[in-house]
UniProtKB/Swiss-Prot annotation:
The lineage of its organism: Bacteria, Pseudomonadati, Pseudomonadota, Gammaproteobacteria, Pseudomonadales. It holds the Pfam family RlmM_FDX. It comes from Pseudomonas fluorescens (strain ATCC BAA-477 / NRRL B-23932 / Pf-5). Keywords: Cytoplasm, Methyltransferase, rRNA processing, S-adenosyl-L-methionine, Transferase. This is Ribosomal RNA large subunit methyltransferase M. It catalyses: cytidine(2498) in 23S rRNA + S-adenosyl-L-methionine = 2'-O-methylcytidine(2498) in 23S rRNA + S-adenosyl-L-homocysteine + H(+).
Length: 357
């Protein structure tokens, strides 16, 4: 099991290779990363048998930026018939697993395999259970089978608590018909990723206030309003009338980069299309000067050196807060609903709850 297999957004294979190789070097795990363009996956081949396991144990999956899902294991070729026997034989030296996910890569070819996986899962699950390889136990490793085709599969393991929350790292979120744009799903997914579900009622509730910079037409504002917050929407463009009719939104025709609230708010969110360094500076200002306690801001990525640019900006933010003695939790992820961008979440850890704005 010396291969780490990683899912990602198509076109970002190089970023995954750069990121995982960076971490491997820091953890002294010898190996090399490889990927083909637009395949929605990458591999890190370890030179030592326990390398992939050490790499996974040394990293927290939610803190990785570009990987959507990962597993350690290896590829096997499958026959046209009786694939289950071949898989069972390969699993002979695997530990007993507590759950099973069948996955495909996020490409057109991968999606065509989805129906095959749905049909194949039930008989495979039955055979694994009968062989004593699969039980219902969340504390045991998850068995992940990623089908590259009907004849090739990556068979791997991942800890359920240190891997993606959803198969392939793709959330099953339903677009709310009332929301004025599909961008609303970006913010909802960000909350799922950065905020534990059992903390939503504490950190996303109706007594809170929020600011949406570059709000029009209101996709992100809708999420704040849906949690009952009073929202200041800052944009020179028009907001959806349905949002204004809620009575929870104040629309200010102003520049999102110059607006500052009169009183601190709980949340600031921003999805303005701008150079990433400028949006990162917004985070530094709003969190650093105490204008908000938590913030979600998207950073639009350059065409080249995308991982290097994100890493540089995150280090700048972290070092700046350390120098000022400000305690902040910093997270960054390329979400499924992100495109040429990543989503940053910052939470101020040394501020009391602001008074109502």
């Amino acid at each position: 099991m010396n291969t780490l297999f990683i899912h990602c957004r198509p076109g970002f294979e190089g970023e995954v290779c750069s990121e995982i190789a960076d971490h491997a070097a820091r953890l002294n795990v010898a190996g090399y990363a490889k990927a083909k363009p637009s395949t929605a996956c990458a591999e890190f081949i370890c030179t030592e048998d326990d390398g992939a396991q050490r790499l996974m144990q040394g990293l927290r999956f939610p803190e990785l930026i570009f990987p959507r899902q990962w597993a350690r294991g290896g590829f096997i070729d499958l026959p046209e018939t009786d694939r289950i026997s071949v898989i069972l034989a390969y699993l002979a030296n695997f530990p007993q697993c507590g759950s099973l996910w069948l996955e495909v890569v996020d490409t057109n070819d991968g999606k065509e395999l989805s129906n095959f996986c749905k049909k194949f899962e039930a008989p495979l699950r039955k055979a694994l259970t009968a062989a004593g390889k699969l039980v219902d136990d969340a504390t045991k490793p998850r068995l992940l089978l990623t089908f590259k085709s009907g004849r090739e599969v990556f068979v791997g393991l991942a800890d359920a608590g240190n891997s993606a929350m959803w198969p392939m790292g793709i959330p099953r979120l339903k677009f709310p018909r009332e929301a004025p744009s599909r961008s609303t799903l970006k913010l909802e997914e960000a909350w799922h990723h950065f905020i534990p579900r059992d903390q939503w009622d504490e950190r996303l509730h109706g007594d809170m206030t929020g600011v949406d910079l570059g709000a029009a037409p209101g996709g992100w504002t809708w999420q704040l309003v849906n949690r009952g917050m009073l929202v200041t929407a800052v944009d020179n463009g028009p907001m959806a009338e349905s949002l204004m009719d809620t009575g929870l939104v104040q629309h200010l025709m102003a520049d999102g980069f110059t607006y500052k609230p009169r009183q601190p708010v709980d949340w600031m969110v921003c999805d303005i299309v701008e150079k990433p360094a400028r949006n990162a500076a917004l985070l530094e200002t709003w969190i650093g000067e105490g204008h908000c306690r938590e913030a979600v801001v998207n950073l639009k990525l350059p065409m080249r050196q995308r991982y290097a640019e994100v890493k540089r900006l995150l280090e700048r933010i972290e070092e700046g807060f350390k120098a000022r003695g400000i305690r902040v939790a910093i997270g960054c992820k390329q979400l499924y609903h992100d495109r040429e961008e990543v989503t940053c979440h910052l939470r101020r850890l040394d501020l009391k709850k602001p008074k109502s704005a």
